[in-house]
């Protein structure tokens, strides 16, 4: 699973949910096909791993998968039935902050229909709406 090796600060503020479109990571740089986010969300390291496994199982050594997002934000949680106060909880899991327009996964070395099906299987593991995009086209987020 993806987690940072070292972090400067163990705990972070949660921040406000995403306003606006992704600034970077909107183009396909490595593969031929990509999976684009259409909604803002926090994607956990477990969800990224589940999507990766779903894709690699479908393509069966045929192609290469690139993960373009990295979970670098720690999310803390307090134990169940704990009284309020006594500080912030311990980091429980890590998330990647994803905004609309962001390419999350890329795929190369397979046919378009295999790539489409692999991305569809991966999208079922993610908590947001996504869109399949090809290398040449710069995807518009408002298209369904």
UniProtKB/Swiss-Prot annotation:
<comment type="similarity">
    <text>Belongs to the universal ribosomal protein uL16 family.</text>
</comment>
<comment type="function">
    <text>Binds 23S rRNA and is also seen to make contacts with the A and possibly P site tRNAs.</text>
</comment>
<dbReference type="InterPro" id="IPR047873">
    <property type="entry name" value="Ribosomal_uL16"/>
</dbReference>
<dbReference type="GO" id="GO:0019843">
    <property type="term" value="F:rRNA binding"/>
</dbReference>
<feature type="compositionally biased region" description="Basic residues">
    <location>
        <begin position="1"/>
        <end position="16"/>
    </location>
</feature>
<keyword id="KW-0820">tRNA-binding</keyword>
<dbReference type="InterPro" id="IPR016180">
    <property type="entry name" value="Ribosomal_uL16_dom"/>
</dbReference>
<dbReference type="GO" id="GO:0000049">
    <property type="term" value="F:tRNA binding"/>
</dbReference>
<dbReference type="GO" id="GO:0006412">
    <property type="term" value="P:translation"/>
</dbReference>
<dbReference type="InterPro" id="IPR000114">
    <property type="entry name" value="Ribosomal_uL16_bact-type"/>
</dbReference>
<dbReference type="InterPro" id="IPR020798">
    <property type="entry name" value="Ribosomal_uL16_CS"/>
</dbReference>
<keyword id="KW-0687">Ribonucleoprotein</keyword>
<comment type="subunit">
    <text>Part of the 50S ribosomal subunit.</text>
</comment>
<keyword id="KW-0699">rRNA-binding</keyword>
<keyword id="KW-0694">RNA-binding</keyword>
<dbReference type="GO" id="GO:0003735">
    <property type="term" value="F:structural constituent of ribosome"/>
</dbReference>
<protein>
    <recommendedName>
        <fullName>Large ribosomal subunit protein uL16</fullName>
    </recommendedName>
</protein>
<feature type="region of interest" description="Disordered">
    <location>
        <begin position="1"/>
        <end position="23"/>
    </location>
</feature>
<dbReference type="Pfam" id="PF00252">
    <property type="entry name" value="Ribosomal_L16"/>
</dbReference>
<dbReference type="InterPro" id="IPR036920">
    <property type="entry name" value="Ribosomal_uL16_sf"/>
</dbReference>
<keyword id="KW-0689">Ribosomal protein</keyword>
<dbReference type="GO" id="GO:0022625">
    <property type="term" value="C:cytosolic large ribosomal subunit"/>
</dbReference>
């Amino acid at each position: 699973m993806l987690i940072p090796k070292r972090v400067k600060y163990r705990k972070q503020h949660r921040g406000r949910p995403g306003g606006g479109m992704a600034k970077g990571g909107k183009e396909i740089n490595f593969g031929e096909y990509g999976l684009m986010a259409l909604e803002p969300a926090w994607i956990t390291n477990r969800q990224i791993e589940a999507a990766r496994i779903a894709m690699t199982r479908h393509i069966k050594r045929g192609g290469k998968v690139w993960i373009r997002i990295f979970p670098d934000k720690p999310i803390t949680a307090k134990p169940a039935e704990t009284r309020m106060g006594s500080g912030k909880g311990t980091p429980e899991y890590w998330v990647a902050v994803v905004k609309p327009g962001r390419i999350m996964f890329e795929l190369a070395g397979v046919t378009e229909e295999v790539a489409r099906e692999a991305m569809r299987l991966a999208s079922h593991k993610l908590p947001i709406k996504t869109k399949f995009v090809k290398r040449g086209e710069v995807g518009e987020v408002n298209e369904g």
